[in-house]
Amino acid sequence: MAGIDQLIINSAYREPTHHWKYDLNGQTFIREEGRRPAGYFIAGQGSNQYNDIGQFIELPLVNRIRPRVKAWREAGYPGVTGVTRKLLDHWNDKDARQYPFFYCQMDAIETLIWLTEAPDAEKVGIDIPSDGGAFRRLCTKLCTGGGKTTVMAMLIAWMICNKVTYPQDKRFTKYVFIVAPGLTVKSRLQVLQTGGDDNYYVQFNIVPIGLMDKLHQGKVMITN
């Protein structure tokens, strides 16, 4: 089986321009242009070869959302609130912190903001299925080491700062409930509490100084 001569082919801080695709028949990896399509692999009934990665199942909804979010980003985030714009400008400011946020982190929070704040005309044909419950459920996915807790902090800051500024806007909330899958994770997520200086909002400069007082008016509860 032919291997990969250059494993890292993209910058962690920009949208991927290429990806590796595995060809089972040729038992080789092919470098293809563009971002890897969203999807997952499942083992087929005849998948007993050690090098058979299984059947690829595309996530068409995600692949429709991605170019919409990209176009919205490049257009300057039309439709967002003043608070959201301040946060986005702050997060995109390369001089605001030693290390910029990863592309996957910005893409995740931008997608959630787009689904919530972008004009309805931009979301025609994008229907997020409901599970029938009382709450709207949205999901983002990041790999191990991708900075999921940081994205959670960005999400919390976006919600709380908007709700405090626009208390009548039902799209936002200043109360955050986090359920952790165990005591260890619960302990690690204490960095999402908004009080004090030993939190991610301060460590990663997620909230500009002018919005910090608004963040402190929110309440975060973490349990397991």
Regions flagged by a language model, labelled:
Residues 1-224:
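RecA-like P-loop NTPase motor core of helicase/translocase proteins
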